[in-house]
UniProtKB/Swiss-Prot annotation:
Subunit note: Homohexamer; trimer of dimers.
UniProt-recorded name of the protein: Intracellular exo-alpha-L-arabinofuranosidase 2
Domain of life: Bacteria
Pfam families: Alpha-L-AF_C
Length: 495
């Protein structure tokens, strides 16, 4: 008998995996927007109306469902009117003390979303803004015609209003968004959200600024005071192997201890979702309010020689395992977790893409998103996994995790992670209810070294490969996983 056992009920769905779990986040931070996404129409780098063509095409492959902007901490010092029409510069006080040109504003962001065919998720300014400013931004974007803001939008080149589905009322108002107490922010949220009105057939999904990590009191206060006025409540949690203030650890030069600690801290998101979810259930037993994990991912020390305020870090196979582990946990909580936005899309923190001048590379995290996109809006299949332990220095974690989903046409996708940096894993999976698969295939992302990563000189060092180390006999699936690996198995429906 294999050391790892699992049962997948191929005909029992536990819920739907909201595609928005695979959302993204792009902040005016470092080279995340400028140089990363936006190069301007005068750039020698190929672009579409100022947006980098290579980055755009790569992001399209991910089927990004939703993109959060302009922050982050930047959102609570962003004054949207400076980014339309005649642009006004400002100081980005949060991230590197740089001058923000506001060249990339509302029109450019909405154009990006249209090109990506994704929903915009805009975060409004509560920390330093006003109710009127937020109200006028909504009017500018979504009112058809005949008002000062809608007429200004038309003067600036956009005739038709945009569709705006998601709007966040402030960001991290417990910290960079104003250092508020939850009671104070709850009252502000109630006030500000009143003026996030629905125009032109819009039905805006309002997201309240939620807790940092394990601040369960914040969640309790917000749900008690404002649950009926919100559609979603956010949660922020970063995977940091070290200490946030004293040293987070290197993205590439790390020890075996740090590998294990990183995996352990990644798994902590499961406990956080359960505990915040239990509080939300107290005030929202029908689970109408979504838990929106709109900032998550690894956070390491910046790369040496870069501006520390730019949060530029490399991305290894370790990051890939962190991403895959998060997705498996998000899937299991798909009733409550309705959106998640990794930080961030390009050149910042756990990025999909890194750029350097004209050059671009895809990170191991990008490849996980690309492999896992098959789970978007699919039915989560009931799965029970009996994993052997991944042991390190007297501590243990489950060595493997498995998630399975079924698409509308009947194809079944199974993703498996082996987080052990040293040991392979052999798993035996019973596929109950499976009669026959017309075809099957496998893809694997792995590496020989735990700090393996892509560079501009070797951009394909870590990439997905065809995977054949498995057998399927009737309804028995046997899989051999190397250390540090993420596998996707697809069983195509017999038509």
């Amino acid at each position: 008998m294999s050391e790892h056992q699992a049962v997948i009920q191929t005909d029992i769905a536990k819920g739907t995996i909201n595609k928005n779990i695979y959302g993204h986040f792009a902040e005016h931070l470092g080279r995340g927007i400028y140089e990363g996404i936006w190069v301007g129409t005068d750039s020698d780098i190929p672009n579409i109306n100022g947006i980098r063509k290579d980055v755009l095409e790569a992001l399209k492959q991910l089927h990004i469902p939703v993109l959060r902007w302009p922050g982050g901490c930047f959102a609570d010092e962003y004054h949207w009117a400076n980014g339309v029409g005649d642009r006004k510069t400002m100081l980005n006080t949060h991230w590197g003390g740089t001058i923000e040109s506001n060249e990339f504003g509302t029109h450019e962001f909405m154009m990006l979303c249209e090109l990506l065919e994704c929903e915009p998720y805009i975060c409004g300014n509560v920390g330093s803004g006003t109710v009127q400013e937020m109200s006028e931004w909504i009017e500018y974007m979504t009112f058809e015609e005949g008002t000062p803001m809608s007429d200004w939008r038309k003067q600036n080149g956009r005739e038709e209003p945009w569709k705006l589905k998601y709007f966040g009322v402030g960001n991290e108002n417990w910290g960079c968004g104003g250092n508020m107490h939850p009671e104070y922010y709850a009252d502000l949220y109630r006030r500000f959200q009143t003026y996030v009105r629905n125009y032109s057939g819009n039905d805006i999904y309002k997201i309240a600024g939620g807790a940092n990590v394990d601040d369960f009191n914040w969640t309790d206060v917000l749900m008690k005071k404002a649950a009926g006025l919100m559609d979603g409540l956010s949660l922020h949690y970063y995977t940091i192997p070290g200490d946030f203030w004293k040293g987070k650890g290197s993205a590439t030069e790390f020890t075996e201890d740090e590998w294990f600690i990183t995996m352990k801290k990644a798994k902590y998101i499961d406990e956080l979702i359960q505990k915040h979810g239990t509080i939300m259930d107290r005030y929202d037993p029908e689970q109408r309010v979504g838990l929106i994990i709109d900032e998550w991912g690894t956070w390491f020390d910046p790369e040496p020689g870069t501006n520390p305020g730019f949060l530029y870090q490399q991305n290894t196979i370790r990051d890939a395992l962190v991403a895959a582990s998060h997705f498996h946990i998000f899937h299991q909580h798909c009733r409550r977790v309705q959106m998640a936005n990794i930080a961030q899309t390009v050149n910042v923190l756990q990025a999909m893409i890194l750029t350097e001048g004209e050059r671009m590379l895809l990170t191991p995290t990008y490849h996980v998103f690309n492999m896992f996109k098959v789970h978007q809006d699919a039915s989560l299949l009931a799965t029970e996994t009996m994993s052997a332990d991944y042991e390190w220095n007297g501590e243990t974690l489950p060595q493997i995790s498995i998630s399975a989903s079924k698409q509308a046409e009947g194809d079944i996708n199974i993703t498996i992670c082996n987080i052990d940096h040293q040991n392979k894993a052999e798993a035996e999976i019973e596929l109950r209810g499976l009669h026959k698969a017309a075809d099957h295939s496998g893809v694997i992302l792995t590496a020989e070294k735990m700090n393996a990563h892509n560079t501009f000189d070797d951009p394909h060092h870590v990439k997905p490969e065809s995977f054949r180390q498995y057998t399927l006999s009737k309804n028995k699936l046997k899989v051999k996983l190397p250390p540090m690996s993420v596998v996707l198995l697809t069983l195509r429906a017999d038509s």
